């Protein structure tokens, strides 16, 4: 445990916040894309589909690298039990709060919008359970994965710490090319696991909890560990904060491959396995692209940026039901996809910010949506 706090990583704080807030244009553009969602516009937009695919191809990989970075930083700062408790509370409490307050009403709304209320009694017990698993976890899935990764990483982080204490500091002798090969092989390994499951027991891949707890965790754990290693080895972090033409070109080629796979791939064939390999390496390359841009443009302290850093989780939590409401009741009345998309951004962001300001003034809600207990104000002793 270290009592000396690490210097503030302003650009990483900012990147994490903007990746969270990107969820708003991501889900609003999903309404206007060619992808089938809960609610869709009458006519899809090719450029909003392209925009949506680009965000989806890299956003969460970069997010989990940053999460791993900060998780290990705090691991060195707190005793083990306190670290686990703090980390799980910070993500677990908002997740458990959002289920009854946000995703349950969202589920009920969708039942009426999609006219499925009459079909609910006809579902089997498992079908009801699985539907609720998908719909109640919904956009909160990454919080569940973070709880799992935090728990799993106890042993891994402890091993990292012991190696730091017993070994002399040395550079992480690994290039971006070697990392690319490693993540390519990890993508193939993940694809192989999925294909084996598809052959042996394909039905389990449609199970919501299995998808969130097992498949999503398996995919994102390399990025989480990479973030921790970037904290341990400053030279590794420097590789990500230094612009790489190879990573930029590689990410562009990977995105083209991603689009081609989306266009010509088949879910009954190898589309999902191919996508996992592509997004694994593209995620790595986009870490370099995003970190280097963020380090150059966002590595400063700003009250406005700090506001959105603090607000990003709450805004992300509430934006999803707001987006679905907009898509169900407002989108049909707007003929232009561009105007609809812009109106959606204003509608969702505006209401989310109002709700954020309201919740800040209610201590219980502030705690439930942040997982942070209220800070006790120490009384000052009067000086005579």
From Swiss-Prot:
Alphabetized GO MF terms: acyltransferase activity, transferring groups other than amino-acyl groups; transferase activity, transferring one-carbon groups
Protein location: Cell membrane
Transmembrane regions listed in the UniProt entry: 17-37, 54-74, 91-111, 140-160, 173-193, 212-232, 240-260, 274-294, 311-331, 338-358
Cellular-component GO terms for this entry: plasma membrane
Pfam families per UniProt: Acyl_transf_3
Membrane topology, as annotated: Multi-pass membrane protein
Top class in the EC scheme: transferase
This protein's pathway: Glycan metabolism; osmoregulated periplasmic glucan (OPG) biosynthesis
EC nos: 2.1.-.-
GO biological process, alphabetically ordered: glucan biosynthetic process
Keywords, ordered alphabetically: Acyltransferase, Cell membrane, Membrane, Transferase, Transmembrane, Transmembrane helix
Family: Belongs to the acyltransferase 3 family. OpgC subfamily.
Biological role: Necessary for the succinyl substitution of periplasmic glucans. Could catalyze the transfer of succinyl residues from the cytoplasmic side of the membrane to the nascent glucan backbones on the periplasmic side of the membrane.
Family annotation (PANTHER family): BLR4337 PROTEIN, GLUCANS BIOSYNTHESIS PROTEIN C
Protein name: Glucans biosynthesis protein C
Organism whose genome encodes this protein: Salmonella schwarzengrund (strain CVM19633)
């Amino acid at each position: 445990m270290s009592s000396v706090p690490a210097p503030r990583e302003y650009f990483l704080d900012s990147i994490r916040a903007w990746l969270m807030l990107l969820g708003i244009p991501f889900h609003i553009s999903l309404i206007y894309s060619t992808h089938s969602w809960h609610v869709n516009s009458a006519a899809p937009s090719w450029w909003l589909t392209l925009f949506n695919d680009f965000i989806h191809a890299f956003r969460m990989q970069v997010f989990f690298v940053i999460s791993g970075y900060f998780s290990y930083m705090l691991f060195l700062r707190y005793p083990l039990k306190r670290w686990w408790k703090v980390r799980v509370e910070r993500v677990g409490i908002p997740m458990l709060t959002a289920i009854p307050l946000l995703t349950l009403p969202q589920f009920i709304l969708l039942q009426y919008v999609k006219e499925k209320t009459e079909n609910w009694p006809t579902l089997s017990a498992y079908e009801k359970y699985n539907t609720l698993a998908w719909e109640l976890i919904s956009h909160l899935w990454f919080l569940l994965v973070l709880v799992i990764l935090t728990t799993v990483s106890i042993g891994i982080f402890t091993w990292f710490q012991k190696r730091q204490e017993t070994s002399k500091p040395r550079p992480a002798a690994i290039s971006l090319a070697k990392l690319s090969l490693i993540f390519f092989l990890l993508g193939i390994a993940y694809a192989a696991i999925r294909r084996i499951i598809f052959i042996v027991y394909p039905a389990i891949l449609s199970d919501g909890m299995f998808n969130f707890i097992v498949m999503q965790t398996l995919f994102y754990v390399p990025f989480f560990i990479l973030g921790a290693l970037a904290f341990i080895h400053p030279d590794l972090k420097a590789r990500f904060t230094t612009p790489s033409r190879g990573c930029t070109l590689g990410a562009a080629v990977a995105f083209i491959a991603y689009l081609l796979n989306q266009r010509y791939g088949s879910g009954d064939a190898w589309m999902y396995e191919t996508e996992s390999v592509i997004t694994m390496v593209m995620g790595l390359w986009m870490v370099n692209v995003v970190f280097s841009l963020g380090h150059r443009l966002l590595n400063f302290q700003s009250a406005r940026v700090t506001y959105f850093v603090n607000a990003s989780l709450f805004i992300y939590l509430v934006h999803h039901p707001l987006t679905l409401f907009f898509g169900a009741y407002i989108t049909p009345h707007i003929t232009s996809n561009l105007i609809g998309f812009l109106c959606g951004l204003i509608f969702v962001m505006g209401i989310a910010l109002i709700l954020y300001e309201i919740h800040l003034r209610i201590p219980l809600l502030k705690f439930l949506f942040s997982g942070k207990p209220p800070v006790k104000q120490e009384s000052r002793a009067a000086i005579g």
